[in-house]
């Protein structure tokens, strides 16, 4: 039996790995062809104004130097081969290896997105539980109304309001950048620069997931076993936290796995508004200047993150939920009998 179970697990995870690899392959083809066939002249990004003065022969030589004069299928095969060796090409705009360019920016995005995700995850859970506990009472109504209003306000507009209030009028928070000039190592200065972008990232996603956890808890609260337990006089707090909240956590964890790329993607707009030197601003620049190598690697990183998180979420649903179902059935019978 153990051998059969191990074989089933190997087959199961093997299928997941195969799905991941096929998805990444399709993504790579789509990203490469869309980037290469997009309108624009990449030579302008690399050579600047000199491009206009080039003769046809010089343009041909320049295209050959950048590997852009070969058939697109040949370019794709070479790009994949180089990628397996960790070589993703040179940035046309920055004249550096694209890995080095991204490495200099990705830390800022991970800090902004990572801290934002943790705060949003914890805050949404607490707000969802609070709203479910005070269902249809004043606290629930106020929080739901505030959440609805907050969710309807565009990120960029909210960011501009914060800049106007706290930077222009009150002058207590910096309006742009990740740190002040010469203060790269000052943690306090970095925290001040992080406050407004972080606020926007959290507020943009917090209420959506708070509503979700509220509704899932209320679904559990209205389950037959909970109603019967209430009739038998079991403590409301014990029912809420030991059974209802616990039973919705697997579904919430799978949702949060999908939320990872969603939250990190939300930092792109925030970075542009606050001139925050992260991956979002870099993605915009790479698209604007037709920096193919940089743009393709950024798109691949984002796409792989989305694929990976979706597979993790699906795996959580398929692996945890069945076990939790058995556990829930046992708990329900204990609650009803007790």
Kindly label every feature range from the protein language model.
Residues 106-139, 155, 184-338:
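Alpha-helical transmembrane segments of integral membrane proteins
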Residues 24-74, 170-189:
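Hydrophobic alpha-helical transmembrane segments of membrane transport/permease proteins
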Residues 1-19, 231-232:
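N-terminal Sec/SRP start-transfer signal
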Residues 145-207:
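Membrane-water interface segments at transmembrane-helix boundaries in multipass membrane proteins
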Residues 26, 30, 34, 123, ...:
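Alpha-helical membrane-inserting segments
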Residues 54-85, 194, 274-285:
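Short hydrophobic, aromatic-rich alpha-helical segments embedded in or entering the lipid bilayer
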Residues 8-15, 126-162, 252:
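Cytoplasmic-entry segments and transmembrane alpha-helices of multi-pass inner-membrane transporters
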Residues 5-9, 68-125:
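An internal, D/E-rich "acidic patch" concept
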């Amino acid at each position: 039996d153990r051998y059969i179970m191990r074989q089933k697990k190997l087959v199961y995870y093997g299928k997941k790995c195969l799905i991941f690899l096929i998805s990444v392959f399709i993504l790579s083809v789509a990203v490469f062809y869309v980037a290469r066939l997009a309108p624009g002249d990449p030579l302008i990004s690399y050579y600047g104004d000199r491009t206009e003065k080039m003769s046809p022969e010089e343009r041909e030589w320049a295209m050959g130097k950048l590997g852009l004069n070969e058939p697109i299928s040949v370019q794709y095969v070479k790009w994949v081969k180089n990628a397996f060796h960790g070589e993703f090409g040179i940035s046309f705009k920055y004249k550096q290896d694209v890995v080095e360019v991204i490495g200099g920016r990705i830390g800022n995005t991970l800090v902004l997105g990572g801290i934002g995700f943790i705060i949003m995850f914890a805050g949404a859970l607490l707000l969802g539980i609070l709203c479910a506990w005070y269902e249809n009472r004043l606290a629930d109504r106020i929080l739901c109304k505030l959440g609805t209003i907050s969710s309807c306000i565009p990120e960029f507009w909210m960011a501009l309001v914060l800049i106007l209030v706290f930077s222009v009028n009150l002058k207590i928070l910096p309006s742009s950048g990740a740190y002040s000039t010469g203060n790269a190592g000052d943690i306090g200065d970095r925290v001040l620069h992080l406050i407004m972008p972080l606020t926007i990232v959290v507020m943009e996603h917090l209420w959506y997931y708070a509503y979700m956890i509220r509704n899932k808890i209320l679904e559990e609260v209205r389950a037959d076993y909970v109603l019967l337990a209430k009739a038998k006089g079991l403590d409301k707090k014990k029912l809420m936290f030991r059974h209802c909240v616990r039973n919705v956590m697997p579904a919430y964890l799978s949702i949060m796995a999908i939320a990872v790329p969603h939250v990190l993607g939300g930092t792109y707009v925030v970075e542009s508004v606050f001139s925050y030197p992260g991956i979002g601003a870099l993605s915009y620049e790479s698209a604007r200047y037709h920096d193919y190598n940089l743009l393709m690697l950024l798109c691949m990183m984002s796409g792989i993150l989305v694929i990976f998180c979706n597979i993790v979420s699906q795996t959580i649903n398929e692996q945890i939920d069945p076990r939790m179902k058995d556990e829930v059935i046992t708990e329900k019978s204990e609650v009803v009998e007790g």
